[in-house]
A protein has these predicted regions:
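N-terminal secretory/membrane targeting signals
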Residues: 1-18
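Hydrophobic alpha-helical segments and their helix-loop boundaries in membrane
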Residues: 17-244
Length: 244
C-alpha cells in the first residue's frame, strides 16, 4: 500500500513538474565595469548581511527578552525540570511578542515598508522610518540610568528629546533594562515557591524524613497552588501590561 502511494505521488509530482514552465536562472560572476556597479554590489552585500542579522536584532529590540527570561525563572521556581519544554516556552514568548509588538510593527510597515515597496522612498529613508517605532518602544521601556550609562561610555552629550537617542545606545540600554525587569519579576515569582519549599523541608525534618528530597514533595503543592490561583492568566496578563 505504501509503495502504491509513493508511486502515485511521484507520478503526479513529475507530471506537474513537466507541465509547469520554470524560468531559467543564470548565475554568473563578472568584474564591475563602472563605479555604479560596484556600489550596487556593495548595497546588495549590506542588505544580505542585514537580513542575516535581522532575526537576532528584532528579538533584542522587542519584548521577547523579558518574556523568555521570566518564563525560564518560572520553570525553575516550580522545579519541573524540563516542563514546559524549551521549545514551548520560546514559542509562547514569540506569540506574546507578536501580540505586544503588533501596533509597533504596523506603524513601521505603514511608515517605511509600504512606501518603499511603492517606490516612494529610498531604502535609507525606509530604514530610518522603519526603525523609529521600535526605537520609541525601546526608549519608553528603558531606564534613564541605563541610557546614561552608555552615553557616558561613548562620551556623548545627553539628547534633548528621545528621537535624538542613537540606535547604538538605545539597543544595549534596552537589553539591560529588560534583563533587570525580568530578574525583578523572577525574584517575585520565586518567593512564594521558596516559602513552600521551606515549609515542606521543615515538616520533613520534624518527621525525621531527612533522606526524602523536599523538592519531590513540594512540587505537587507548587503546581496545585499555581493552578488554583490561575497562574498563567495572572503572569501573562501582568507581563503584557508591564510594557509601556
Amino acid at each position: 500500500m505504501r509503495a502504491i502511494f509513493l508511486f502515485l505521488f511521484t507520478s503526479v509530482f513529475l507530471a506537474a513538474a513537466e507541465a509547469t514552465q520554470f524560468p531559467s536562472i543564470n548565475l554568473s560572476l563578472s568584474a564591475p565595469t563602472s563605479p555604479q556597479d560596484l556600489v550596487s554590489s556593495l548595497n546588495v552585500l549590506v542588505v544580505l548581511t542585514l537580513l542575516v542579522l535581522a532575526p537576532s536584532l528584532i528579538l533584542v529590540m522587542t519584548s521577547f527578552v523579558r518574556l523568555i527570561v521570566v518564563f525560564s525563572f518560572l520553570r525553575q521556581a516550580l522545579g519541573t525540570q524540563q516542563q514546559p519544554p524549551n521549545q514551548l516556552l520560546v514559542s509562547l514568548a514569540m506569540v506574546l511578542t507578536f501580540f505586544i509588538m503588533e501596533p509597533v510593527a504596523t506603524k513601521s510597515y505603514d511608515n517605511a515598508i509600504k512606501p518603499y515597496l511603492d517606490k516612494k522612498i529610498g531604502y535609507e529613508e525606509a530604514f530610518e522610518k522603519g526603525v523609529a517605532p521600535f526605537k520609541k518602544f525601546m526608549i519608553r521601556n528603558t531606564r534613564e540610568k541605563d541610557l546614561a550609562l552608555f552615553f557616558r561610555i561613548r562620551d556623548l552629550k545627553n539628547p534633548q528629546n528621545p528621537e535624538a537617542v542613537p540606535l547604538i545606545v538605545a539597543i544595549p540600554a534596552f537589553i539591560i533594562s529588560e534583563l533587570k525587569s525580568a530578574f525583578e519579576i523572577g525574584f517575585l515569582l520565586y518567593l512564594p515557591f521558596l516559602i513552600i519549599d521551606m515549609v515542606v523541608s521543615s515538616v520533613l525534618m520534624s518527621m525525621g524524613m531527612m533522606m526524602l528530597p523536599p523538592v519531590m514533595i513540594s512540587m505537587p503543592f507548587k503546581l496545585l497552588i499555581f493552578v488554583l490561583v490561575d497562574g498563567w492568566n495572572l503572569l501573562v496578563g501582568n507581563l503584557i501590561m508591564s510594557f509601556k
